[in-house]
């Protein structure tokens, strides 16, 4: 249920905008799934070495786990933004915690640490700061960039809010300035 002061995404939405939003999220998930087989190989040379003829038969994801962490967390953020009408860090983080407990496919070390802290009652942004402080060598962060899609869709008409939320959503799993910077840069473009 939307908060009283939240902007509703209800019936006033332009149907064409809804169709475009669905298309953007579908394209994001499809592209992500196609990239999963090469995700941890690192360089183009490593990918060519592992797949000299290209990826011909991407691994089928497990039935119980259709999405990896980046896609799942992006879709859950989109769901939170749609249902809450605005960015609610606690709501998004709790959705991610439930997903982690039920599935958690592909979740990174820092994201898991931060979400476990959230599960224990730590405020989401503080959880991100603590997770990064405990294991700074584990910082990665392309998921923050993927999650810019629902942020841009929701706040396309409010650049100030778009910039703020793009940075905030990146800080929850782990407060890594590079993730926030890249997510902000890509969202604004």
Regions inferred by a protein language model and the residue ranges of each:
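Structured, active/binding-site neighborhoods that engage oxygen-rich ligands
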Residues: 2-189
């Amino acid at each position: 249920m939307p908060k009283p002061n939240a902007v509703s995404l209800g019936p006033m939405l332009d149907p064409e905008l809804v169709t475009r939003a669905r298309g953007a999220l579908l394209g994001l998930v499809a592209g992500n799934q196609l990239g999963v087989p090469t995700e941890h190989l690192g360089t183009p040379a490593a990918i060519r070495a592992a797949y000299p003829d290209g990826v011909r038969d991407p691994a089928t994801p497990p039935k119980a786990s259709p999405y990896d962490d980046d896609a799942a967390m992006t879709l859950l953020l989109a769901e939170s933004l749609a249902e809450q009408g605005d960015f609610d860090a606690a709501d998004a983080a709790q959705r991610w915690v439930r997903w982690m407990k039920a599935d958690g496919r592909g979740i990174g070390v820092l994201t898991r640490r931060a979400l476990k802290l959230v599960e224990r009652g730590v405020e989401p942004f503080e959880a991100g700061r603590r997770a990064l402080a405990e294991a700074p060598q584990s910082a990665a962060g392309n998921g923050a960039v993927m999650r810019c899609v629902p942020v841009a869709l929701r706040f396309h008409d409010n650049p100030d809010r778009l910039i703020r939320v793009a940075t905030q959503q990146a800080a929850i799993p782990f407060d890594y300035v590079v993730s926030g910077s890249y997510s902000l840069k890509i969202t604004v473009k």
